[in-house]
């Protein structure tokens, strides 16, 4: 199999908006992909096209029927993108809102008494919802501790928290602070052995852009993404629910279809952008497989993305040619360590006893966009056990280049020399 090279990266970058330049601040290198990925040009064009159409779905006219077909096609494309053979996709306000909604409905569809199991690695979107509904239902909330050293969760650590009265289990597919992925299939297998009827809800928001989703293999009940972190745009979230959760009691209009999860008129253009994402992944996958099946192309693209981003983060950490990597700088500490196979396109670090926001501000002045994570309600679950007040998050994607990494390392060397 071939891999993404710098020539292909140039072609990839032609597919995206604002690759080199921020429309507000000017030229910049974008290493803030965990905050939101770049948007496909095709997704922007699709959004513009559908934003001007006044018609709604469900009417007896050609435009309305066409909109219905677009949504139907988008759901089929989502099925290929995420590999689902059953269940239902639907749209909501955001990824966070959908996690709250799925967790709420999973809890309300479960027997009284028991527990919800989550992990200290999770984003507050799932942890907050799980804790709220544990209190509402008088459940026990149990948290699986993540490994501070590796920045991820060992699936075996779930075993002691799961019992036959576990009602809901939440899993984060990748952390937006540590940058580490989790082993969904292994965790799910442990859950099913002890609590076969528990609902398993996965936060896929951070993972989605970094190389492959395979829901069919996970044995779960819910999966949520934020499309603006998967090459689409802001303004909506996408959720998948299993048939078991789809048919469970949930919010719906009185007299409407019993298994419908959509609330209100959907943004057809938003759905259509997910077809653009699917087509992009197929286009990329064709570089690595001769198979004409779209799912195989998407899988090939995912493997290539993972490999490329691994090489890029290795360069960030270990350097290249005469450029030192972050690991070579004195007093630099890196979340998850240096050789972590769970890393997904993200490096979080600090310079000991030095404010991270000053580093981020310096890099921003050099035209490199990164982000400060502080010990607040978003990140204290990761930073507090480390004894850190903050960190610098450098988050890349497969459209970033080796020359951009070199510029970052060069700027960090100049910063340290000061």
Where are these regions (language model features)?
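Pyridoxal 5′-phosphate
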Residues: 1-418
């Amino acid at each position: 199999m071939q891999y993404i090279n710098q020539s292909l990266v140039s072609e990839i970058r032609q597919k995206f908006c604002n690759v080199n330049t921020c429309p507000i601040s000017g030229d910049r290198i974008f290493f803030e992909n965990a905050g939101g990925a770049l948007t496909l040009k095709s997704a922007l064009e699709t959004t513009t096209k559908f934003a001007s159409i006044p018609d709604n779905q469900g009417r007896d006219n050609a435009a309305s029927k066409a909109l219905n077909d677009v949504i139907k096609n988008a759901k089929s494309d989502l099925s290929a993108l995420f590999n689902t053979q059953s269940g239902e996709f639907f749209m909501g306000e955001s990824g966070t809102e959908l996690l709250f909604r799925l967790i709420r409905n999973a809890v309300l569809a479960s027997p009284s008494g028991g527990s919800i199991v989550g992990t200290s690695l999770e984003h507050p979107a799932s942890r907050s919802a799980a804790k709220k509904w544990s209190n509402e239902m008088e459940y026990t909330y149990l948290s699986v501790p993540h490994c501070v050293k590796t920045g991820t969760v060992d699936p075996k650590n779930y075993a002691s928290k799961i019992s036959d009265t576990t009602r809901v289990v939440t899993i984060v597919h990748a952390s937006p602070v540590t940058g580490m992925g989790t082993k969904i299939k292994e965790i799910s297998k442990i859950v099913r052995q002890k609590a076969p009827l528990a609902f398993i809800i996965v936060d896929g928001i951070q993972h989605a852009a970094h190389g492959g989703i395979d829901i069919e293999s996970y044995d779960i009940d819910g999966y949520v993404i934020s499309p603006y972190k998967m090459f689409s745009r802001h303004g909506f979230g996408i959720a998948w629910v299993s048939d078991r959760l789809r048919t469970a009691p949930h919010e719906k209009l009185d007299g409407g279809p019993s298994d419908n999860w959509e609330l209100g008129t959907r943004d057809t253009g938003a759905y259509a952008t997910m077809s653009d994402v699917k087509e992009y992944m197929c286009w990329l996958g064709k570089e690595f497989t001769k198979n004409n099946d779209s799912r195989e192309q998407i899988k090939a693209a995912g493997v290539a993305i993972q490999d490329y981003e691994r090489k890029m983060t290795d360069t960030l950490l270990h350097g290249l040619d005469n450029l030192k990597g972050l690991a070579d700088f004195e007093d630099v500490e890196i979340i998850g360590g240096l050789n972590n196979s769970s890393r997904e396109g993200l490096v979080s670090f600090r310079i000991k006893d030095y404010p991270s926001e000053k580093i981020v501000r310096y890099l921003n002045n050099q035209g490199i966009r990164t982000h400060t994570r502080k010990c607040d309600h978003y990140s204290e679950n990761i930073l507090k056990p480390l004894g850190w007040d903050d960190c610098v998050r450098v988050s890349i994607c497969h459209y970033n280049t080796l020359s951009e990494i070199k510029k970052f390392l060069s700027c960090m060397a100049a910063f340290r020399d000061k």
